[in-house]
Amino acid sequence: MKNLPLEDNVIYTYLNDIVDTILLRDVISRNNIRNTDFYKNLIVYLAKETWNLFSTKKISDYLKSQNINIATNTVIEYLNASKVACFLNSVSRFDLKWKKIFEILHKYYFSDIGIKNALLWWYSKINISWILENVVYNDLISKGWEVYVWELWNKEVDFVCKKGEEMMYLQVSYLLESESTKQREFAPLLEIGDSWKKYVITMDENASGFIDGVQWINIIDFLVNIK
């Protein structure tokens, strides 16, 4: 790997070989998945729609709209196989008011960003914010945080994080290039009434300061300094 040329086609070939090995050997073969084309389409769909909250029925309905008929139970079976293989992780929705976890809706993140990039190599609409969100999720899990997502009244907090009795809330975005973007990212956090730490995480080099108790922080600073 150290001597691999940093050329797009070489990188793609290398990552794609890894994807084929993981999908074909570690998931499809071990779980005796017969509908391999559907399984691959399912994983690509999840990679492309990272930002979305899903139910297994919603996934099944979408696939039916693409003329792919598959039972909801089969979707559940394939998703569970992917999680057991440790390349796909699900995040449940958290109700801040009632402090409850809902198991119906989930977001899905990839344990290796390279796998996700290989799956989406052909896709021209990759949103950098989706990649950053996945990076932050992986970092949180590695540091022992429980991670959930909150959605209410069409506003979403990307991550509700718990570690023991401690909590924090995170929004992840690429750049806050306009005042309207800044307001959109800060607004959900400003509606949370407790005193736990709240962060808007971006790649802006000048990311710093607070707005009504919500800290704006550069993603590198967050990954390095927030334990």
Where are the language model's segments positioned?
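Hydrophobic/aromatic beta-strand patches that form the interior of the parallel beta-sheet core
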Residues: 109, 170, 199-201, 215-217
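Active-site-adjacent loop/helix micro-motif of nuclease/hydrolase catalytic cores
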Residues: 176-187
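Short, hydrophobic beta-strand segments that form beta-sheet elements in well-ordered domains
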Residues: 149, 195-202
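Active-site ExK catalytic segment of metal-dependent nucleases
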Residues: 167-177
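Conserved beta-strand segments of alpha/beta enzyme cores
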Residues: 146, 197, 213-215
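Domain-level recognition of nuclease-like catalytic cores that cleave nucleotide substrates
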Residues: 205-227
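Arginine/glycine-rich "motif VI" loop of SF2 helicases in the C-terminal RecA-like domain
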Residues: 187-196
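Accessory nucleic acid-recognition modules appended to NTPase machines
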Residues: 3-167
